[in-house]
Amino acid sequence: MNIVDQQTFRDAMSCMGAAVNIITTDGPAGRAGFTASAVCSVTDTPPTLLVCLNRGASVWPAFNENRTLCVNTLSAGQEPLSNLFGGKTPMEHRFAAARWQTGVTGCPQLEEALVSFDCRISQVVSVGTHDILFCAIEAIHRHTTPYGLVWFDRSYHALMRPAC
């Protein structure tokens, strides 16, 4: 059996462009957030998406206990916020760097996000070092910014909506 080594896998995955998201939660275990690109649609019936979260991450206990989250998809120009939520910055400083609303689940919803998906975690599957969080979408909020943001080849890239 051919086993792919970790670095080869990571290098190959860098070729897959993905939206940049800040995943947030709030509840009995407190407010927390992190940057993620491992987010995707599962089904539209019922509307469900998934988020992958490392069980060794400092935010894991909050998401595991709160069982709610908001996927805030970033737009171009929000790279500094992505970097802030992707580092070791204390939570209160992360959240102080942007304007937030409270979503229907009680999770922080980024006011300037391209789109926000407010969710309840409906199922968790553990694979290797990560939990795959299946999330039932309870509300969606869209913003009208024309520029998206993707992570590709280990750097940020802006995307522009085509003119209609």
UniProtKB/Swiss-Prot annotation:
Pfam families: Flavin_Reduct. Catalyzes the reduction of FMN to FMNH2 which is used to reduce pyrimidine by RutA via the Rut pathway. In vitro, the flavin reductase Fre can substitute for the function of RutF, however, RutF is required for uracil utilization in vivo. One of its GO terms (biological process) is pyrimidine nucleobase catabolic process. The keyword DNA damage does not apply. It catalyses: FMNH2 + NAD(+) = FMN + NADH + 2 H(+). Belongs to the non-flavoprotein flavin reductase family. RutF subfamily. It is an enzyme of class 1 (oxidoreductase). InterPro entries: Flavin_Rdtase-like_dom, NADH-dep_flavin_reductase, RutF, Split_barrel_FMN-bd. This is FMN reductase (NADH) RutF. Its EC number is 1.5.1.42. It comes from Escherichia coli (strain K12). The Rut pathway degrades exogenous pyrimidines as the sole nitrogen source at room temperature but not at 37 degrees Celsius, a restriction that is apparently a consequence of an inadequate ability to remove toxic malonic semialdehyde at the higher temperature (RutE/YdfG function). Induction: Up-regulated by the nitrogen regulatory protein C (NtrC also called GlnG) and repressed by RutR. It comes from the Bacteria. Gene3D superfamilies: Electron Transport, Fmn-binding Protein, Chain A. Disruption phenotype: Cells lacking this gene fail to grow on uridine as the sole source of nitrogen at room temperature. GO terms for molecular function: FMN binding; FMN reductase (NADH) activity; FMN reductase [NAD(P)H] activity; riboflavin reductase (NADPH) activity. Keywords: Flavoprotein, FMN, NAD, Oxidoreductase.
